[in-house]
């Protein structure tokens, strides 16, 4: 099987990345072909054969440099376009999503579904939740009383 592992960071950074790399290694050891999609970064240790990655938003650059960031963290045209290049080339049987919030956005799910319909490919989508961010922007799942 061909499996596309998707995570915003595709270099060692934290728990989600460790998990993603361990899953990729295990899948390869069992004879599956694995490629990765995420942010463009010089630290990337894995990737895809077409070199299609999303431009990293550097939030440390201040407000002026990131005026469109509030929109890009909800919906990313660039991420949709870049994942389509990988889908067309790799033709995965499974797309396994991990941390996609802020940089990649759920917009990539729309592109995966569009690609599946257009190609009639029976590609499965799997999503592993590593935190609450997609359902609670503050990550903590606190109520108004911070409980």
For the regions a protein language model found, what residue spans apply to each?
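Short beta-strand segments
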Residues: 7, 36-38, 96-99, 129
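Short, solvent-exposed loop/turn segments at secondary-structure junctions
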Residues: 10-11, 41-44, 101-102, 131-134
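Acceptor-binding helix/loop patch of EC 2.4 sugar-transfer enzymes
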Residues: 60-66, 128-147
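Short N-terminal targeting/anchoring amphipathic segment
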Residues: 84-104, 123-128
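Short aromatic-enriched loop/helix-cap "lid" or pocket-rim segments at secondary-structure transitions
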Residues: 17-18, 45-50, 108-109, 137-142
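Metal-centered catalytic cores of metalloenzymes
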Residues: 21-26, 53-56, 132
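N-terminal subdomain of nucleotide-sugar transferases
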Residues: 1-43, 88-90, 108, 112-123
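A conserved catalytic-core segment of Leloir-type glycosyltransferases
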Residues: 29-94, 141
